Amino acid sequence: MAEMIIPYPQLKKIMKTTCEIDLYKTEAEDIMDVVEKKLADLFEVAHRNAKEENAKIIKMRHIPLTKGFLNSMELFRSVIEEENIVAETIKKYVMKKIPGDLPLDDIVVDNLPLITGTIFIVVGRVIKALHEDIERIRKEHIEEAKKVLDYTL
């Protein structure tokens, strides 16, 4: 199994707490692929927004975060404390994956764990919205959520 952004046992519990669905290891890896892609998409747009402003650094305002995303971010913020998730580990992992030639503002760097974790929650919440009665995430659910996020995020 590839390196996980958030350790599997914690991610499993987060999905159960925030989305009321179970997550197995194989599907956790599939969700991680979606999260990495969506994170890259967010920062591609942020990079473009910063360049359009002739900014020398990517700031939070450059990242296209919707109201729904920000609400999910607050949900993840409450869970990250309960689960004792090590934010520094997430920051280091994500910093290696972000495309672009502009540096990130310190506030953006500090928010990387929240942004990243929120994408996991958004994937889970999209799955739950499409399949209210499911108890366990399956590969086909992740594919559906990916399609929705490709249009919206």
Curated annotation (Swiss-Prot):
Signal peptide: none annotated. It comes from the Archaea. It comes from Methanocaldococcus jannaschii (strain ATCC 43067 / DSM 2661 / JAL-1 / JCM 10045 / NBRC 100440) (Methanococcus jannaschii). One of its GO terms (molecular function) is protein heterodimerization activity. This is Uncharacterized protein MJ1509. CDD domains: HFD_Aq328-like_rpt1, HFD_Aq328-like_rpt2. InterPro entries: DUF1931, Histone-fold. It holds the Pfam family DUF1931.
